[in-house]
Each structure stands twice: as C-alpha cells, then as structure tokens.
C-alpha cells in the first residue's frame, strides 16, 4: 500500500490573521471544499474509490479572536514576560542573562550561567515556574524537571506533559488562560492551548469500503496511525501509543 500525506496550512494562517469568526475564514473553507472535491475527483479517476481510504482531520483548532467580543480579551506579552522573569532571577542570584529565549509557551534558561555559578538547575527551574504563575494571563507553569519526573494522569497537566519533548521543550512550559493569546502583530487568534476550542477537531475517514456512519464519541488522535495501519494491513508504527478505533475492527 501507498500512503500520501498532504498538509494544508492556509487555514491556520488565515484564522490567525482574521479570526475564526471572520468572513475571510468562511470564504477560505468554501474554497478549500471545492479544492478537495477537485482532488478527490482526480484521485477517483485514477483509482477505484473502494481502494482508497481518505482521512481528513486537523492537528489543532484555534482560539476565539481576542477582539471579537464587546470587551477585548487579555493578551500575553511574551517579551515582557521574558524580561521580568530574567529580572526576578537577577534579584535572586545576581546579574546575568538567566533567560535566553521564550518560544511557543516554552521558557529557556541559560544552563551555562547556572552551572558556572554552581547553582542547581532543578531549583532554578522551579523558582522560575513558581514566579511565572504570578504573571497575568498564565494559567499553568510547569518545570522541565516536573514534566520528566511526575505523572499527570488527567487534566491540563496531562496535556502539557503529552506535548513535552525533553530534547526541545523549555525549562518552564506555560499554558495561558482560556481565550488569552500571545500578543503579536496582525494576529487575532492563535493555536497551541490546552482548551477545547484548540484540542477538539473533526476526524473523517472515508472510502475503502468503510460503511457510512456518524460517531459522536470522543476519540484520541493517537488512534489515527494504528487505525490506518490496521486498514492497510501493515504493522503499526514502532512509537505508536494509540489503539485501533473499534468502529473499524472487522
């Protein structure tokens, strides 16, 4: 069997710029629907529909526009956050560039400076995480050590831990308040939170002899890969953690 992956990134960019409530997003989805129809018609002209399984989903949703309501929602000033956390660590441990970067809800500390001063990295991470919780717009702040050494079996902690990758994630991982997004030029909406508007997306499997039906229950996105492997009659990916969706077991 062959597997073709297509990523369509325009919806994210348009939603970020204009907001999910906008006529621009509505127009974009209308055009996207037409383009998908053209693609499927072309595909089915080459291959019989029963020989093709189409999976349509998204890796995330997006937040409501910060200025869509009568009162504007708070926005998170990442540059200011980085400066203030650095100032806090300077006050605690002396001058220096303690914070080297903040990107996509991840705060990165200066490990070289911490080690040169003979300080404990875990302690500094925990200090920064505790202080970050006082910042306006921050809902959760967890240290890298907590992510690696603790088990969060439910709630937002579990979602943050599932998104954590030790080689790339920051020393402190931040989750913002519901509806709060990072302040950026020309950005009205943003993805990357742990809330339902961001984590609930449609999942459509079509073709390949799959009977037509609507399933109302929630499923985990980690089930997509093993379900596809099952339908293609090939081994599951080695790092796969999900289970085959019961609706597709023969």
Predicted regions and their residues:
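Extracytoplasmic/secreted cell-surface and envelope-processing proteins
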Residues: 14-17, 63-67, 117, 183-185, ...
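Soluble non-cytosolic domains of exported or imported proteins
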Residues: 23-30, 34, 118-123, 215-222, ...
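Substrate-binding rim/cap in mid-to-C-terminal beta-strand-loop elements of soluble/periplasmic
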Residues: 79-122, 190-232, 246-250
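Short, His- and charge-rich active-site/binding loops that engage polyanionic ligands
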Residues: 172, 176, 180-192, 196
